[in-house]
């Protein structure tokens, strides 16, 4: 994608602290990329699947975002918004409201609480994870084992939007 919007993208950065029962991830920020995928084609979800495949984050599903707070301890997650618009809550109850639209991407580090507050009828998301990671669906406070899993989860080798050397690889660094 030489010269593409995705290649030149700079994300919005959202740092989330623990919030009630939602652990979030104090070391790794949420990254939100705006308008990085052209969704004017016949199958915009396929454009996200192709992008994520090229950048080493194989796409796993097409659907939406659950309407309840949840987080993952066993996977970092990228959400590609292929159609419609939505208002999400990131970080758990009373967290940060984020509006997303077709063409946007959100990268959620393990532990990040997220839920859909409202969405247009055509809202469609492509979800992907780094190789070797599979999401669990957590809706309660983390046990010590769950917290250790979040802290020890390997960092992705590439940014799901820009690939090797993309913003994630510099913004997500071990201390």
Q: PLM features: residue spans?
A:
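A short beta-loop-beta micro-motif enriched in histidine and acidic residues
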Residues: 64-78, 93-94, 100-101
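Short, conserved beta-strand element in jelly-roll/cupin
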Residues: 72-89, 107
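A short, N-terminal "cap"/entry segment at the start of jelly-roll beta-barrel domains
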Residues: 1-69, 169-175
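Double-stranded beta-helix
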Residues: 117-175
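A structural preference for long, well-packed, hydrophobic secondary-structure segments
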Residues: 75, 88-98, 115-116, 134, ...
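Conserved metal-binding segment of the jelly-roll/cupin
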Residues: 100-120, 129
